[in-house]
Amino acid sequence: MAYTSANAGQVGPARGASLDRALRKLFPSTSKLTFNPLFRAAVNAFDVVPRLMFPEFRTLPPNHLRIRIGVGNRILNNQTHFLVHARDFWMFVFSEGIATMHSDILDIGVGCGRWAHWLRDYNFRGRQFTGTYVGVDIDEEAIAWCQNHYDSERFRFFVSTDTSVSYHHTAASQSVYRIPLADDSFDLVFSNSLLTHLLEAELENYLRESYRLLRAGGAMMHSHFNIEHPPATYGTRHTFRHQMGNAQIESEAQPEAAVAYHTDFLFGLCRKIGFSSCEIVHMPGGAQHQPILLCRK
């Protein structure tokens, strides 16, 4: 398949590895820092001058929301990363015929719209996106920002009642979360790095929900941490040394901060759910992108 990279899992040593490991022991999840008022004020203050200098940055969400979703682990100077990171994903999706400009698309864990803004702001081969795009997330602040910055004709965003330790949500815990959308209603269900924060029971729940919501022939695409295709940060920021069931986790104190799985386990689970085909694909750029679990209904 196009864009699949045999070398995407190869990684090398990184500078500052010791410092990075030390910082990650103190702060396994930078997302939690973005709820601190002092941290928010500081990082948003650094955003003022770039917004004045570059018109392209003025439509971006505030810096603390960008940091919360993970923009290359950068606290500052992350604007370009936010703007371009989804480009290869959509080029792959449309060039491979996984979705079209008229498709119904569900983004689970939409955050502040890093993937959605491409379908709002850009044309593909001269055609504008005219389908429907639904984004769901547990982060009420991020969803509110999206609702205020996207047109309601094509885009709809709503808050999930699911829970997450890493994302500081306070809703009542549920063992099984059902996304309040109709069966067989989407051509593409995808997420960016959602699975990297899901332990086994929640992982299975979201894979089953993806299957339920897809139309026949539709595709599920979830980026994730994969032991057989390790990230560029493997051996520095990430080691996944702790096992919890079929999951490999980075931090026992905050197990949802970073979760990885083996390919065989993911494929077996997806086939049990009912998907007809499963594969791991990589976007251009190699290990800087997470591998994607691509399954067809």
Describe every region a protein language model picked out.
Residues 199-200:
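Helix-capping/helix-break motifs at membrane-protein junctions
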Residues 204-216:
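A short glycine-rich, Lys/Arg-flanked "PGG" loop and its adjoining helix->strand segment in the class I
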